[in-house]
Amino acid sequence: MEQIILSRKDSITITKSLVTDILLLGVIYMLPTISHLLAFPLYLLDPMRVVIFASILLSASRLNSFILATTIPLFSFFVGGHPVFVKSLLIALELLANLALFWFFYKKGVNVFVTTFISIILSKVLYYILKASLLDAGLLKMELVSTSLIIQALVAVAISLLMALFMKNNLTNTELG
């Protein structure tokens, strides 16, 4: 029977990824409480998307970002009951598409700001197409657009600026992946 032996470097990388994931999940888990204490609806700032982009900056593994994109909405549903399960799946798909598009454009050498912004916008277009389909099918009962498109655009610009700033000034492990 073969035994898998991890190198010290692999063990450290895995440990860092786990610690990063736990911290990021903790932030997401605490958002409703923080939002209540601040009397400000933090969901307007697109915290799940912020977390997946933070994971790009903080994690040594692209796979880690994809795992977070898949699990954060489901974690939120199972722990807090919000958003509803179908919408949680929809958000997970949107975040996965966002990451896939980000890496696609990034590998093509597109400017980080443009890469981030376009990947957010295209993943939101996918989200709204799928959400409209789910609304038409009666699988969701809510408004198509619950957060102002202007606020969403401003948040997309802010995330894009931050990504451009941090990736320019702090060459991260994303360059390795």
Where are these regions (language model features)?
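Interfacial aromatic-anchored transmembrane helix boundaries in multi-pass membrane proteins
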Residues: 29-45, 72-102, 131-136, 144
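A helix-boundary/kink motif common to multi-pass secondary transporters
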Residues: 60-61, 111
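Short helix-perturbing small/polar motifs within transmembrane alpha-helices
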Residues: 2-27, 68, 89-132, 164
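Membrane-embedded alpha-helical hairpins and interfacial helices in multi-pass inner-membrane proteins
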Residues: 85-89, 105-177
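Hydrophobic alpha-helical segments of integral membrane proteins
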Residues: 30, 69, 73, 77, ...
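Hydrophobic transmembrane alpha-helices
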Residues: 2-57, 63-64
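Transmembrane-helix signature of polytopic, membrane-embedded enzymes
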Residues: 62-70
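Hydrophobic transmembrane alpha-helices of multi-pass small-molecule transporters
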Residues: 50-54, 77, 95-99, 124-128, ...
